[in-house]
Regions:
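Amphipathic alpha-helical interface surfaces
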Residues: 28-31, 45, 61
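Amphipathic alpha-helical segments within well-ordered protein domains
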Residues: 32-36, 50, 108
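Short hydrophobic alpha-helical segments that form membrane-spanning helices or hydrophobic packing faces
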Residues: 45-51
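Catalytic Zn2+-binding segment of zinc metalloproteases
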Residues: 52-59
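C-terminal accessory module of base-excision DNA glycosylases/AP lyases that mediates lesion recognition
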Residues: 62-136
Length: 136
């Protein structure tokens, strides 16, 4: 685990962005960049904070997810905000799929507790990765 280092130079902006994220607003590239710079200069750290603030909208972005999606052994590109934004867009497209609701329900039943739609997709990716099932 990485020790948290906060850069509070843009404290007011960071608080405003986090409040926006909490109220179901999808934040933009510049806002994610400000959060990234404030939290260890880490997109992974920023995504984790966003996920804990609003798990319905923000998924965690980490090396395991990046490697699964890109099929790369390296994490070169994990810090690219566009990659994270595209990941969130992709998750939202999956959630909109007419068949997703029944799959989401099956995951609830399997785990014996409710998860967010984003978390259900993460669980599927984790299991596919563990079982070496391709992402396509």
């Amino acid at each position: 685990p990485t020790i948290l280092t906060l850069n509070l130079k843009d404290y007011d902006k960071v608080i405003s962005i986090l409040n926006s994220a909490k109220t179901c607003k999808q934040i933009d590239y510049n806002e994610i960049s400000i959060l990234k710079n404030a939290i260890n200069n880490s997109l992974v750290g920023a995504s984790k904070l966003l996920h804990f603030i609003n798990p319905e909208i923000y998924a965690i972005w980490d090396s395991r997810i990046f490697k699964y999606l890109t099929e790369k052994k390296s994490t070169y590109g994990i810090a690219d905000i566009d990659n994270y934004i595209n990941y969130l867009k992709g998750l939202n497209e999956i959630i909109k799929n007419k068949n997703f609701g029944s799959l989401h329900k099956e995951i609830h039943e399997y785990l014996n507790h409710k998860t967010t739609a984003m978390r259900s997709i993460e669980i599927i990716m984790f299991l596919c990765n563990k079982l070496s099932i391709n992402n396509y």
